[in-house]
Design a protein with these regions (language model features):
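Buried hydrophobic positions in well-ordered alpha/beta secondary-structure cores of metabolic enzymes
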Residues: 5-7, 33, 62, 73-76, ...
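Conserved catalytic cysteine-centered active-site region
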Residues: 31-50, 83-142, 148, 260
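Active-site-adjacent elements of ketosynthase-type condensing enzymes
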Residues: 85-96, 127, 151-153, 186-200
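Condensing-enzyme catalytic core mediating Claisen C-C bond formation in acyl metabolism
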Residues: 1-48, 157-234, 238
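Short beta-strand segments
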Residues: 79, 143-149, 171-173, 255
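Cysteine-centered functional microenvironments
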Residues: 48, 77-80, 107-124, 156-160, ...
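Hard-cation-handling environments
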Residues: 242-244, 254-255, 260
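Phosphate/pyrophosphate-binding loops at sites that engage ATP/ADP/AMP, CoA/4′-phosphopantetheine
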Residues: 58-74, 221-250
Length: 260
């Protein structure tokens, strides 16, 4: 059975700080931000918005766009680094807000959790829900996977220029129009490091930027090597002696905190 992303909606707060204004306030070169890092504007939440609010708006957009009703949604996962509570999952807040639109208990049947693992938690949420669909448990229902964050850094820190806020809601089913995930081979790589983390009680992360960039490259290489070994073992791809795994890949979709 196929499984993947059928549609996507994005919600970004209406308030923003122009990157050139930020650069002048911090004594930075605006060209470095706009051309070097690809940053033109920094989204800012209003006083009545939080990550759950952003996620709810993204979900509402994708549901209304596809004319879906709550009974057609079987799962709702939220992936975030901006948790509101140490126990109560953010998806329950999102469901509560959606029920203000669709009615009390209209999402009472909807399973889900909050996922946390820095920037990769959304990928794991996608992985879990595509497997739920492939297993036949969805019963023709959709899964909603939402990534939502308010990224804040210490004032004057190197990470301050990459701040922002927003949410992306991905609608998953067994007949995806946008992207189908390969069910045969998945690879990952993990190591316990302290390049980017946010201890309990701290609103901003502790970041070692250059070290984090290096670790990212190492982990991507390790995951790609593991993927190559798996596809060779399963026979999914036949790699000749004068070829690399990249000769059999049309596109690479990478996570990057900045465009250059």
């Amino acid at each position: 059975m196929a499984a993947g992303i059928d549609d996507i909606s994005i919600y970004i707060p209406q308030l923003y700080l122009d990157a050139s204004d930020f650069a002048h306030a911090r004594g930075l070169d605006p060209e470095k931000l706009e051309r070097g890092l690809g940053i033109g504007q920094m989204a800012i939440v209003d006083t009545n918005q939080d990550p759950a609010c952003l996620a709810s708006n993204a979900c509402l957009k994708v549901m209304q766009k596809n004319k879906l009703t709550p009974d057609q949604i079987g799962r709702l996962y939220v992936a975030t680094e901006s948790a509101l509570d140490e126990s109560k999952a953010m998806n329950s807040y999102v469901i509560g807000m959606l029920e203000q639109v669709y009615g009390d208990d209209t999402f009472g049947h909807c399973g889900g959790i909050e996922c946390k693992f820095a920037c990769v938690s959304g990928s794991y949420a996608l992985y879990d829900n595509t497997n739920w669909i492939r297993a036949g448990e969805a019963e023709d229902k959709y899964a909603l996977v939402v990534v939502s964050d308010i990224a804040k850094y210490d004032m004057g820190s190197s990470g301050e220029v990459t701040q922002g806020a927003g949410a992306v809601a991905m609608l998953l089913n067994d007949k995806p129009r946008l992207l189908t995930f390969d069910p045969k081979v998945t690879s990952t790589s993990i190591k316990n490091e302290y390049d980017f983390y946010r201890p309990f009680g701290k609103e901003t992360p502790i970041v070692h930027g250059q070290y984090s960039n290096l670790l990212y490259l190492i982990q991507v290489k390790n995951a790609l090597t593991d993927y190559k070994n798996k596809v060779k073992r399963t026979g999914l791809i036949k790699i000749k002696d004068d070829e690399t795994i990249l000769d059999h890949i049309d596109y690479l979709n990478m996570h990057l905190p900045y465009s250059n």
